[in-house]
Amino acid sequence: MGLIVYYSSATGNTEHFVSQLGQRFFKIDKKISSALVYEPYVLVVPTYADGEGRKAVPKPVIHFLNEVENRKLMRGVIGGGNRNFGRNYSLASKIIAEKCSVPCLYNFELRGTDEDVICVKKGLEKFWKQ
């Protein structure tokens, strides 16, 4: 199974979701976002957009992905968000998927549901076998 790389804010929603997956993970640190990973991974990222969709991708994630090696090893992205934000729901994952030419594998709301966790576990298992 591959590595999960994630970023989580003070709400801890993304961190909670990732912790339920039972897989190895690496947290992008707000203070040391230029860290490198050395194996293929799936990125799990929340969305922080204003009403116009600006600044959807958290700055530490941008810094992390500015490292060429980190971009090369990303195999997919999973997005967290809040459906109350309508068209901006999980916007960060869509932006990253498009800019980095990787698939957006799944989107979950807030902390995710038990069903989300099951779907992502099964989906990642299948994804890493490809």
Curated annotation (Swiss-Prot):
<dbReference type="GO" id="GO:0036211">
    <property type="term" value="P:protein modification process"/>
</dbReference>
<dbReference type="GO" id="GO:0010181">
    <property type="term" value="F:FMN binding"/>
</dbReference>
<dbReference type="InterPro" id="IPR004465">
    <property type="entry name" value="RNR_NrdI"/>
</dbReference>
<dbReference type="Pfam" id="PF07972">
    <property type="entry name" value="Flavodoxin_NdrI"/>
</dbReference>
<comment type="function">
    <text>Probably involved in ribonucleotide reductase function.</text>
</comment>
<protein>
    <recommendedName>
        <fullName>Protein NrdI</fullName>
    </recommendedName>
</protein>
<dbReference type="InterPro" id="IPR020852">
    <property type="entry name" value="RNR_Ib_NrdI_bac"/>
</dbReference>
<dbReference type="InterPro" id="IPR029039">
    <property type="entry name" value="Flavoprotein-like_sf"/>
</dbReference>
<comment type="similarity">
    <text>Belongs to the NrdI family.</text>
</comment>
